[in-house]
Amino acid sequence: MTNPTSHFTCLVCKSDKLTKMTGYESAHLCKCGNCGFVFCQEIPSIKELEDHYDGYGRNDYLSPITIKRYNELLDEFEKYRSTNKILDVGCGIGYFLDEAKKRGWEVYGTEYTDEAVKICSDKGFNINKGKLDPGNYDPEAFDIVTSFEVLEHINNPIEEVGNFNSILRKGGLVYLTTPNFNSLLRYRLKAEYNVIGYPEHLSYYTPKTIKLLFNSSGFKKKKIKTTGYSKTRLKTSQGQSDQAYISESSDDEQMRHRIEKNKLLQFAKGSINFGLSLFGVGDSLKIWFEKN
């Protein structure tokens, strides 16, 4: 029996009311007429995925500002500490888990590449290779599950979020980030927006559709934010620059450092992000959901 090559129902609500999105044919995007979820209708083959990710470079740059943001998140997570276990799904080489471990958390992670798994294992982390498998953990073992920029890469979101539910204790928290399909940049650039691309990104979320996904999987919303407007993304999407999105010299990173040193710029950033979140049009979708 051959594997299917296309989805015929919505990945979130299972409706068959799917419409191909004009202008996004190269990414095979369709939109659900029932819930509005946008996703890649084409199912990439194993070979397509291997060919893509074999050439997927690893970027080891870690901004000191990112470390600061990680610790601000961990400050928020303190009130959830009960089992003292935290899992980062798609943990890379463990930068977030480094900070969690320093604060006394028992840290766990999942990652696909042998290299990243070895690096994390050498740090003493509890790492499993491959996709999240709840069979690798005790039921309701974790206080916190995090996942930074991972959900857009998968085409089985109901299964993934259901797995979050099974390994989190009651009242435990999921914190997750993913690109926002309703961002100002996507509206401006449309299919030129380089966040959109097959077979790397297969699912595209908005505040509405990610809330639907988590609410239907046994979670309740604590917070949803959409923040940021990336000058780096704008320039690279338009072919005006080839700078790495995450790098010390990128326009975005230089701006982050200027903002950190200037109280007025910090106030301006906060005000802009408030407006972007209010209207749901920031680049990054950040969610906090508790297990019912």
Question: Where on the chain are the PLM-derived regions?
Answer:
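Conserved N-terminal segment of class I S-adenosyl-L-methionine
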Residues: 1-148, 158-163, 226-227, 250-262, ...
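Short glycine/proline- and charge-enriched loop/turn segments
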Residues: 54-61, 189-198, 237-249
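Short catalytic micro-motifs in class I SAM-dependent methyltransferases
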Residues: 148-155, 177, 200
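Helix-to-beta-strand junctions that scaffold the AdoMet/dcAdoMet cofactor pocket
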Residues: 154-155, 168-170
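Short N-terminal helix/helix-N-cap motif within the alpha/beta-hydrolase-1
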Residues: 155-159, 186
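Short, glycine-/aromatic-enriched active-site segment of Class I SAM-dependent methyltransferases
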Residues: 174-203, 208-215, 229
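Conserved catalytic loop of SAM-dependent methyltransferase domains
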Residues: 222-256
